[in-house]
Structures are given as structure tokens and as C-alpha cells.
């Protein structure tokens, strides 16, 4: 028994090391790749100081943090709702952030600065999260709370569609591109959004014990003495914050939170002591690679990264759906 535990521990360490190396390679490639390839030896040249340190580095850090946040949010939601198909957009938080952004553009008549739009997007996400917490305080089952999130997402999506469809504002039409996800406008001015993700990411990665209990199911978690109501509220709020900040930073990006945790579980990373940091590393790597594809796929334009993740993630989602039906 002890030998099996040690073998599993060594395997988990190998996985984390491999994912760390993959993330570092993706980070290095992201800094080098672009319209002009800049090798590490040229990073401190005048050209490198402009393209690498002022343009590519803030974008790369944003992609890394958003990918980690979305993947960890997916792992938390899948444990919280006991559903392998749960993902960050499922609770309607992403669409809530979109509604907040559209409301800011309408009320500000396109004159608000980018940081104000970001705050409004976070506020929209947190409002949806507070509504979900109201449902959670009624001690609803996870399935009903999940359905409440789906309903809120549909309502927010309808509000965004109505606002954009009847708008003559160029800014609102450009929001459709923003909602498809993209890091094209990210620079050091958005560093406060990046910093807002780091404390919550680190905190959730340290909560493996309650996450392991939640993964056993509500009844088992209660029997083990876990204050279920408290942890459900805290985790929903933390997920809402991470998704809201991610949407404010890069728009709506799907499938990272769905695919990454499930693939890692299939690889044997079921213990949240390993799964949570593994999701952070794998999510960051996957989104970095998707961002590189979005930048290089077209010569004269940049693909929305949400299109890339949807193209790669949709077949996996269908496979998971068919597997769940069995």
C-alpha cells in the first residue's frame, strides 16, 4: 500500500514537472513569435525592448493568468456541482460581465476609459455571483443551483443580443468581437487586472482539502464535517471573481475550464493537491498556445482567441457529452 502511494506521488510530481516545462516552453515561444520573430539573444536590443518587453510580455502574462484562472475555475465548478461538464461560463458569470460592459458603453456613450470598462465588467460578474449566492443561501441542491446559473446566463445573453442588435454605436458592435475573446489590446495599463487574479489563484490552489471533500459528494462532505454552505458560497464567489476579471481582461473564452480539468483527471490527477496546480499550469500552457495560433494564423489580421479555443474544444465537449450519456 505504501509502495503504491509513493508511486502515485512520484507520478504526480512527474506530471507537474512536465506541465511546468510545457508552460515555460509556451511562454518562451509566445515572447519570440509574432509578425517578427525575435530570438532570446535579441530581447535586449532596441527592437526587442519595444516588441518583447512593452508589447508581448504583458500580453503573455495576461494569457498565462487568464488560462490558469479559467482552468482552476472549471475544476472548482466540476467538484462543486458534481458535474464533469460544468465550466466557468455555465453559471452565467461571463455573460454577466458582458452585460456590465455593454451597460457601461451605453451609459458612458463610449467616453469611459478602459479601466472603467474593466471595473464595470467585474461588477456585472459579481452581481450575477451575488444572485447565485442568494440561491445558495436557500440551501438549494447543486443541480438546482446549476440550473439557476444556466437560466441567468441565458437572460444575460439575451440582454446583450438585444442591446447590440438595436445599437448604431460602433463601440457596441466592436463588443461582439470582444466577447469572442482576445488579448490584442492588453498592455501594462491592464496590470492591475492581472494582479487582481494572483491572490485568488494562490488561495484556491491551497484549498485542496475542502475540494477533495466536495468531490466526494454533498452527503459524504457533510459526514466528514465540512461546512458545506460556507464553502459553497466562498467558492462560488471566488469563481465569480476570477471569471469576471478574466472577461474584463480578455473577453469571453470558452472550453478551457471544461476541457483541461477533465483531461487531467483522465490522466490520473484526481487529488486536488495535484489537480489544482496542474490545472493552472495546463490551462496557462493551452491558452498560450491558442494565443500563438490566433496571432500567426492570418498574416494581416488576428483571430479572436475564443474562436481558436472553441474550434479545438468543441469536439472534446461533444465527446464528453456522449461519454456522460453512457
UniProtKB/Swiss-Prot annotation:
InterPro entries: ABC_BtuC-like, ABC_transptr_BtuC, ABC_transptr_permease_BtuC. It holds the Pfam family FecCD. Gene3D superfamilies: ABC transporter involved in vitamin B12 uptake, BtuC. Keywords: Cell inner membrane, Cell membrane, Membrane, Transmembrane, Transmembrane helix, Transport. Its main location: membrane. GO terms for cellular component: plasma membrane. It is found in: Cell inner membrane. One of its GO terms (molecular function) is vitamin transmembrane transporter activity. Part of the ABC transporter complex BtuCDF involved in vitamin B12 import. Involved in the translocation of the substrate across the membrane. Belongs to the binding-protein-dependent transport system permease family. FecCD subfamily. This is Vitamin B12 import system permease protein BtuC. It comes from Escherichia coli (strain 55989 / EAEC).
